[in-house]
From Swiss-Prot:
Name of the molecule in the record: Separin
Major place of residence: cytoplasm
Key word Magnesium present: no
Gene Ontology MF terms in the entry: cysteine-type endopeptidase activity; endopeptidase activity
Peptidase C50 domain ranges (all copies): 1647-1741
Length: 1828
């Protein structure tokens, strides 16, 4: 419908009808709006189309407007909260809103605005204009109430314009029409802000316009606040109180209307407060808050004057809150003092309207504020005002007094009208009567803390006596707080603050030289400390008095100090530590001397005895040198006192102290105690038997402590002999005495065995205990034993074990453990069941170690029956962890895990609390952790397992280091008993690191174990650990060192027991295996199997000892028999299970089978594998080992099948790729084959097809078998085993792919093959990094139980997500090339990995050229490796010696040899490229493929194949994978030297693909020359049309552990390319996933954020001369000719974007790998030292070196050298590299800058020795760019 028709159709509507419609919500619609506009427009335009047209007047419009506004308010009130929010959003985007969905509110507002516009049009006079203004303000009010500010902005600006017009023409009747026209306004918040100010008018006009103006100004502020601008400008804020601003308009508009004025003031105040919260400028916020406070104060004063109901408290609270915000905002750097004074002054007169309490609050805040501004005089003025006002308020009075103290410290010239000490003293009494509230106490403590801090640093105020008096008074005041009403958190908070207050007081006290004069002043502080249970202050004060005593030369003052010190210690119960003994000793020294009278001496001794009684009564007395000193002096002094006085003195002491004296008296030579004194002490003890037992037990303790000290042992033996003589006459019928007799006899024999290693001594010990049990087993349970006596027995028990265990006498250990098990079984009281659990568990574990699982289970079961009686958790835990480990080792893994979940971590205190000595407790705890670590290790939790062992080693290290500083009596007796457990802990740590592939760490811990074991006098103990070290060194590539250890032990092992012969043979077998002496390895492993049988027979005799009449005879027979009796089937019916021993034999048989397989004895290997399976435990490790062996047997069988066919036998020497044939082509042929159609391919012989199928099935079985165990192997197996599994998977996958015929479906794909090739490369690295993080994060393990450990699992990579997570996360322009050599060193595996593509994998046999040309020299891997090592070794040697040559002739010779080595290295790299890579070197070429040209080349390639293979039209030409065809492109344009040979390599590769996949043809019929020419023509066509583009590609080399030492970056095919390297794809992904990596591709380095270290060793003068000026000029933080500390080094790495190091090595001498592992961020690092980038090979283990440490620390880019370099050449390289990178010169903008990888590549050529020095620098990680 046209506009005209709309208009004509609506003329019948009258203004009254419109007004009616606008009054009702249901009439509001788009139609009404259109009608309204049409109707009003008719009137305005005066188009009288119809006589009935409506007649609109200004009054009609005004009424319609009011109706619409009223309706608008109603409509809005009825909307829900959700609809209101939706409507607000509609107003933000009205143009994009469908009109059909607009609410009525929207149309009403449109009507209002339109009517308002028309009112403006028809306005003729000021009255009309006034109504327009009122209407504009009204609609703005509604909009702002609705929080819709967008349309309100323009309305307010129009209203402001109208206001200006109205005020201008206020005295005129008419207004010029041109003035009222509405020009286009610049609608913005900034323009709106200027509308706040309206010109002031005369007072006579306020009646009509004032209210409107004020409302308008408030609406402007509301709109500005809703629009969320940054705040008001400073100019606007300063003018708010101007004549045109809202302040003055409010004051003049409502001179007598208080309520109206206050309501506007309140709104304005709230708006200003809101603006203060969104301001970005502190000054502006400050001014706004001041204005807001002024408004509130005006409201307060006017309301009080009006005297109406008003909530004064609420208003004052608001004012105080705002004032607090003002104080918080005020900072001298933001708000100047002059501005502060000026703005604060305007509030002074208003503050008088506040209540007294509020004024006190503000005065206190003002004093603090001006104090903050260092205006101490003005601050003091406010303090004085506040003090005067707070006369009756003691709380505020105290605050002002304390603040005056703080001001006095700053400025002692300030005079206060009061005496601070007197005023505080008067307050003290008031607070005693009226308790100090908690909140006031906190404020008081905070205030005094700040004051005391100032006092400590003040140079103006130094009156310490004054400060101490204040502390005393405040202490009494603080003591008035009622503690009982405080909650726990409040009390703790108060105690903490009081502790700080007391420490400040103590700091003051320390300044006094004569402290005893101020005892009264100290009482308040000591009382406060006692009231709040703080022991630190009295302890420090007591110790300080002791120190004053020691330092004082005045004897009397010293006595006063020590007396007060002891008094404080006693009154505060500080009598249980060593310092208390020192005070007793000092007091005794000062007061006792020979010149004293007898009574005076007795008094001093009596006082000392009383003081010692307090010590003995509050602590468990241990060894103490101070106590020894006191006792010596006491015993010396007793010699001058007669017997009667001695008896009186001894009668007054406690029984505990008496026993202590008696023990010391028995050590007469040590304490100078006479025999007479010992006799007196013994008489004072109760009865003879107790004296004897006590003395005997003391002798046992001395024997235990004196072990390993020859002189002391002699003394102990004499004491023991004397006790034995006494015992022999009393022990015939007394079980308790007989037990002590056996104990002393055993000690004597054990000490003698220690000296001579005489086995008869051990037999005597066992026999004596056997006799004792047989005689007293029935009566001993009725005897009562003290903890001291039981500990004496246990000390001997553990001492015996710790002595015999290192000797290797396993049968002695077993016999002794069983005897003591029977002994404690006889002593079975409830309190002794825990010892049975310990002994039984140790016995079970010993049987388990030997392999006799049945015997172990028997004693575990017996122990379990006692667990119900034993309620002590550490002993239950001890059994739980040992039994859990047993279950795991015997194949019951699930049960073992359930058992371990019952375990909770024990501590030394747990064992100590059960009455065990510290030595025994430590041993049990450390032993328990070894068991737990071993169990977790068996389950695959290597990181946590290592954590527990490192805890052990940390404890042991602390004890060893402590004991080395102590005398004999302090610690040595502990450390020798920890030798065995320490050695075993080190072995456990070594085994875990060995499992993780970290040979260097493993070697360290093995050597630690050897070092510890050598301190023991038993050769077998040391030999055990040396053989383990031998095994490690052999497998780590250090064969010579391993052989030497083995040779040194050869003679010793001939005369040892069977068990150690077994260990020696095992080590010998590993040495032979490493040397590839298969016969020798098999011989020694077979000998191990025989020795296991002998062990089984020997221990069978021991197990049946109960049939012997004497246990000793059975043991003698066992230890002395020369020809063992072998166990047969007939005599084992009653014998025990030995599955663990048999499992060991099974492992040996598997090893023998492996070597028989290498010898080619397939059938023998199969038979041995079958035998091993029969006796193997079904544990995880056995399953993995069995699967690996089974897979290798299948592979060997497959290899023999290959050699049976003339076609397939060439497969091992042929290049194999995955993929080969296009997947699409394979799929199409598979469909054709399924439909039964003729594929056109000729079948080969049936035999060949049969062999191919058989091979594929075998290879598939290998792959599937290994894939099944992969996940568990990755999580739990060693790194070596995991690599072995993955190599089998990769080999079988690629070989199976090569044999897949065309059209055959297969589940083999390159992504899964690449996954198994790449994943194990990072396993060792990640395990080591996790272990380091675990050790750094868990210095102490805090697991409450093993539940959370055992429920957690290692994150295992998933082959299904490999493509997404690893490959497709790479940058699209990257070319990742992975290089791996197999274990035999015969095949090179190269993978090309790109985003969006499946990996391309090649197996390149290094001898493939020899199969085509027998005369061609083969470059095998070992030969190339040896040549590289020779060149580098010679270069390293020459680099070190070159600086010593001074003669010209020597230098020339040196340079000649260096150049020759450079040429040798160049030739080696060229040979590697030609011989190893050949035609496949294009895999490194980052050539960007032109898709259209490539499609054309692919088509030509198909035609060439069809032509040269003479295929008929029915036979489809096999389509190769695009990745294969790209190899021809990446070889480059034909024509360069050697191209034909490279192309020939690819041609033969293609022929092999077709042949092995079932396309049969005769090699002789194919003209390879013609094929080569055709391909060159096609390639020339490609390159002639190819347009090169800028290539920003980057190549990342993923180098396996055996190939990393080669400088691949310097191969000719990689020359001048951007190349970096990483050890694994996983490490690359970790780097790319870091947050600072840009676009997942590179890192950016800020040029100014760097650090450096230059010449820290002071011997690189040339380097310093070259770089010093440039580094200093760069302005970076660094060190020149100065050695950094570890902290400096770490800070430079973590606190900057890049780090330069010009020194020796890689900085290893300044930091450690563990420190690097703690870094959360590591800079881009450039290490230009020799061999800083070298990774050192470790045989079958993982390499180690500086680069791995930096990569582990998160370093994204590391530049380092692979070998030693000469400084001048590498300095030249470094300078060129850093200039090219852009660090030393201004470069172009970032888009044209050079990455560090390109800079390194381009800088190699500047070296004189291009390869020897230029090839050494490499980059680990990803590219890095300098940000300009």
């Amino acid at each position: 419908m046209s506009t005209r028709s709309i208009v004509t159709s609506k003329v019948s509507w009258t203004p009254e009808k419109f007004i009616s419609a606008l009054s009702y919500p249901e009439h509001c619609s788009i139609t009404l709006v259109k009608r309204l506009k049409a109707s009003v427009k008719l009137k305005d335009l005066k188009q009288n189309i119809s006589r009935d047209a409506p007649s609109w007047t200004f009054e009609h419009l005004f009424v319609a407007f009011k109706c619409a506004v009223s309706n608008l308010a109603k409509q809005w009130a009825e909307l829900s909260t959700t609809d209101k929010e939706k409507t607000r959003r509609m107003f933000c985007t009205p143009s994009r809103l469908n009109t059909a969905h607009r609410p009525e509110v929207f149309y009403l507002l449109e009507c209002c605005t339109y009517i308002l516009e028309q009112m403006q049009v028809v306005t003729k006079n000021t009255s009309h204009l006034y109504d327009c203004i009122r209407s504009g303000v009204s609609i703005c009010n509604r909009l702002l109430d609705m929080e819709i500010f967008e349309p309100a902005i323009s309305l307010l600006m129009k209203t402001h314009k109208n206001l200006i017009i109205l005020l201008t023409y206020r005295d005129h009747d008419a207004i010029p029409t041109a003035t009222l026209l509405n020009p286009t306004l610049d609608v913005s918040e900034i323009q709106l802000e200027s509308c706040l100010f309206v010109p002031m008018v005369p007072a006579s006009y306020f009646l009509n316009i004032g209210t409107i103006v004020v409302t308008f100004q408030l609406n402007v502020l509301r709109c500005l606040s809703l629009s969320q601008i940054n705040g008001l400008s400073l100019n606007t804020i300063n003018n708010l109180q101007s004549e045109d601003g809202p302040f003055q308009w409010i004051e003049r508009s409502f001179p007598s209307q208080v309520q109206l004025a206050n309501s506007r003031r309140e709104i304005l105040a709230r708006l200003l407060t809101r603006f203060s919260m969104i301001q970005n400028n502190a000054l502006q916020s400050f001014k706004l808050l001041i204005l807001s406070i002024a408004l509130w104060l005006n409201i307060l004063s006017s309301q009080r004057a009006d005297d109406k109901e008003f909530d004064v408290n609420q208003l004052e609270t608001r004012i105080l809150q705002l004032f607090s915000k003002v104080v918080q905002l005020c900072k001298s750097e933001d708000i100047e003092g002059s501005i502060l004074n000026k703005d604060m002054t305007q509030l002074h007169h208003l503050l008088e309207n506040l209540s007294k309490e509020s004024r006190l609050h503000i005065l206190l805040q003002l004093s603090q504020l001006y104090y903050k501004y260092n205006d101490f005089q003005l601050s003091a003025a406010y303090v004085i005002r506040g003090y005067s006002l707070s006369f009756e308020d003691i709380s505020f009075k105290l605050k002002f007094l304390l603040f005056s103290f703080r001001l006095s410290i700053h400025d002692n010239s300030i005079c206060f009208p009061f005496n601070l000490i007197q005023e505080l003293s008067s307050l003290q009494q008031l607070f005693v009567e009226n308790a100090l509230p908690y909140s006031e106490a906190l404020h008081l403590l905070d205030s005094i803390e700040r004051s005391f801090r100032l006092f400590n640093d003040s140079t103006v105020f130094d009156d310490t006596v004054f400060a101490l008096n204040i502390s005393e008074i405040l202490s009494w005041i603080l003591s008035s707080v009622v503690r009982d009403i405080l909650v726990e958190d409040e009390l703790l908070n108060l105690q903490l603050k009081i502790r700080k207050f007391l420490m400040f007081t103590f700091h003051i006290i320390r300044s006094f030289s004569e402290l005893t004069k101020f005892q009264s002043s100290l009482e308040g502080c000591l009382n406060l400390a006692a009231y709040y249970e703080d022991a630190e202050f009295p302890q420090k004060l007591s110790n300080h008095l002791y120190n004053l005593c020691v330092k004082s030369s005045n004897v009397n003052y010293a006595r006063e100090c020590i007396s007060l010190s002891i008094k404080i210690a006693v009154s505060h119960k500080l009598t249980n530590d060593e310092t208390y003994l020192l005070k007793i000793l000092k007091n005794f020294q000062l007061r006792y001397h020979d010149s004293l009278q007898l009574q005076e001496k007795c008094d001093v001794l009596h006082t000392t005895f009383n003081q010692l009684d307090l010590y003995v009564g509050t602590t468990s007395v241990g060894k103490s040198s101070v106590l020894d000193n006191i006792l010596k002096r006491i015993f010396n002094s007793l010699t001058s006192i007669n017997d009667s006085n001695i008896e009186k003195l001894l009668e007054s002491i406690s029984y505990s102290l008496l026993k202590l004296f008696f023990k010391c008296a028995n050590e007469g030579s040590r304490y100078n105690a006479s025999a007479a004194l010992s006799f007196k002490l013994s008489l004072m003890l109760h009865e003879k038997e107790e004296v004897l037992l006590l003395k005997t037990n003391v002798s046992c303790v001395l024997a235990n402590h004196g072990y390993n000290d020859i002189k002391f042992e002699e003394m102990v033996l004499c004491v023991i002999k004397g006790d034995q003589n006494l015992l022999e006459h009393n022990s015939n019928n007394n079980a308790k005495l007989a037990l002590n007799e056996s104990l002393l006899c055993s000690w004597e024999n054990l000490l003698c065995y220690r000296r001579a290693e005489d086995d008869s001594r051990i037999l005597t010990i066992i026999e004596s205990w056997t006799i004792f049990i047989s005689r007293f087993s029935s009566v001993i349970s009725r005897c009562s034993f003290t903890d001291f006596e039981i500990n004496s027995i246990l000390n001997f028990f553990f001492c015996f074990l710790h002595t015999v265990e290192p000797s290797g006498k396993l049968t002695f250990e077993l016999a002794f453990l069983e005897i003591f098990y029977e002994l404690f079984n006889c002593l079975l009281h409830l309190q002794f069941s825990k010892y049975l659990v310990i002994i039984g568990t140790l016995l079970s574990d010993k049987y388990m170690t030997l392999g006799f699982s049945g015997k172990a289970h028997l004693f575990y079961t017996k122990c379990y029956s006692y667990l119900r009686q034993c309620k002590s958790s550490p002993f239950i835990n001890f059994w739980n962890v040992s039994y859990g480990k047993y279950l795991i080792l015997t194949g019951n893994t699930d049960k073992g895990i359930l058992q371990l979940k019952k375990y909770s971590l024990s501590s030394e205190e747990d064992f100590n609390s059960n009455g065990l000595s510290r030595t025994v407790s430590l041993n049990l705890l450390l032993y328990e952790r070894i068991q737990l670590s071993d169990a977790l290790f068996q389950l695959g939790y290597t990181t946590v397992s290592l954590g527990f062992i490192m805890q052990n080693l940390k404890v042991i290290k602390g004890l060893f280091s402590k004991s080395s500083k102590e005398h004999f009596n302090g610690g040595k007796y502990i450390t020798w008993r920890l030798f065995a457990v320490s050695a075993h802990s080190n072995v456990c740590a070594a085994r875990i690191y060995e499992h993780m592939g970290q040979a260097r760490e493993a070697e360290f811990f093995y050597r630690q174990a050897c070092s510890i074991s050598e301190k023991m006098p038993f050769s077998c103990f040391s030999a055990t650990f040396q053989l383990r070290l031998c095994s490690l060194l052999t497998r780590a590539g250090k064969l010579e060192k391993g052989e030497k250890i083995l040779f040194d032990l050869t003679e010793a092992m001939k005369s040892t027991d069977t068990y150690h012969k077994l260990l020696w043979n095992y080590g010998a077998a590993e040495v032979c295996a490493t040397k590839s002496e298969l016969d020798g390895a098999i011989c020694h492993y077979s000998e191990c199997v025989k020795l296991l049988e002998i062990i089984k027979s020997e221990y069978y005799l021991f197990f049946n000892r109960n049939r012997e009449k004497s246990l000793t005879k059975g043991i003698k027979r066992l230890s002395l028999s020369s020809q063992p009796t072998f166990v047969t089937e007939s005599n084992t019916t009653e014998f025990d299970d030995w599955s663990i021993l048999q499992n060991t034999a099974a492992n040996l048989l598997r090893l023998i089978s492996m070597f028989e397989l290498k010898r080619g004895n397939l059938e023998i290997a199969k038979a041995l594998m079958t035998d091993s399976t029969k006796c193997s435990i079904a544990s995880f490790f056995n399953i993995v080992s069995a699967n690996i062996l089974k897979s290798k047997l299948i592979v060997c069988e497959a290899d023999s099948t290959l050699f049976g066919d003339p076609v397939l036998r060439t497969l091992p020497d042929s290049v194999i790729s995955l993929p080969g044939i296009s997947h699409k082509f394979q799929k199409n042929q598979s469909k054709t084959k399924a439909l039964g159609e003729n594929t056109g391919f000729r079948k080969g012989s049936k035999r060949l097809d049969y062999l191919r199928e058989r091979l594929k099935i075998n290879l598939q079985n290998v792959r599937l078998s290994c894939e099944i165990i992969f996940s568990n192997a990755y999580e739990r197996s060693s790194v070596c085993v995991c690599r072995e599994v993955n190599e089998l998977i990769s080999y079988s996958t690629i070989m199976q792919s090569a044999l897949t015929t065309i059209g055959e479906t297969t589940d083999v794909d390159s992504s899964s093959a690449s996954f198994f090739l790449e994943i194990p490369k990072a396993l060792g690295f990640h395990r080591r990094r996790e272990a380091q993080k675990f050790r750094n994060q868990h210095k102490e393990l805090h697991f409450s139980s093993l539940e959370q450990i055992l429920n957690s699992r290692l994150s295992i990579p998933d082959v299904r997500t490999f493509q997404d997570n690893f490959i497709d996360s790479l940058p699209s322009i990257w070319n990742v090339v992975s290089i791996t050599i197999n274990n035999s060193g015969e095949d090179l595996f190269i993978s090309k990995i790109r985003k969006g593509h499946s990996p391309l994998i090649f197996r390149l046999p290094l001898q493939r050229h020899n199969s085509r040309d027998a005369d061609e020299e083969i470059l095998v891997f070992t030969k190339a490796q040896t040549e590289l090592f020779r060149i580098i070794s010679k270069s390293n040697q020459m680099a070190q010696n070159g600086k010593h040559y001074t003669r010209r002739e020597d230098k020339e010779t040196w340079w000649k040899e260096r150049r020759h080595l450079d040429q040798c290295l160049q030739q080696l790299l060229e040979n590697i490229e030609i011989s190893w890579l050949g035609g496949f070197k294009g895999i490194f070429n980052p050539h960007k493929i032109d898709t259209s040209l490539f499609a054309k080349f692919s088509s030509q390639f198909q035609n060439i194949i069809a032509k040269n293979f003479n295929m008929d039209k029915k036979t489809p030409v096999p389509t190769l994978s695009p990745e294969i065809l790209e190899l021809f492109i990446t070889l480059g344009k034909p024509g360069y030297e050697g191209y034909e040979q490279l192309l020939e390599d690819l041609i033969y590769f293609i022929l092999d693909i077709f042949q092995f996949r079932g396309l049969h043809f005769a090699y002789d019929e194919i003209d390879t020359d013609q094929l080569s020419m055709d391909l060159q023509d096609a390639l020339n066509a490609y390159f002639n049309n190819y347009v090169s583009e800028e290539n920003r590609s980057h190549t990342v080399l993923v180098l396996d552990k055996s190939v990393h030492q080669f400088p691949w970056e310097s191969l000719p095919c990689l020359n001048r390319q951007s190349v970096s390297r990483v050890p694994s794809l996983s490490i690359l992904r970790d780097i790319l996933s870091q947050s600072f990596v840009v676009n997942g591709e590179y890192v950016e380095v800020r040029k100014e954020a760097g650090s450096y270290i230059l010449n820290p060793s002071l011997d690189l003068k040339h380097t310093q001369e070259m770089f010093e000026h440039k580094l200093v000029e760069g302005g970076w933080k660094g060190l020149i000719a100065s050695q950094p500390s570890n902290r400096d080094f770490i800070k430079m790495l973590s606190g900057n974007d890049f780090f330069l190091y010009f020194g020796h090595g890689g900085g290893e001498q300044y930091t450690t790998s563990y420190d690097l592992a703690t870094l959360k961020r590591c800079a881009v690092t450039i290490l230009m030292g020799c061999s800083s980038g070298a990774l050192y090979e470790c045989g079958s283990f993982e390499p180690w070196g500086t680069p791995l440490d930096y990569l582990s620390a998160g370093c994204p880019t590391l530049v380092a050298n692979l070998w030693d370099v000469t400084d001048k050449d590498i300095d030249r390289f470094s300078l060129k590299m850093l200039e090219s990178w852009g660090l030393f010169e201004n470069k172009a903008p970032f888009v044209n800058s050079t990455s560090i990888c390109t800079a390194v590549s381009e800088s190699r050529s500047c070296c004189h020795l291009r390869y020897l020095n230029g090839a050494a620098p490499v980059i680990y990680g990803i590219p890095a760019y300098i940000i300009p």
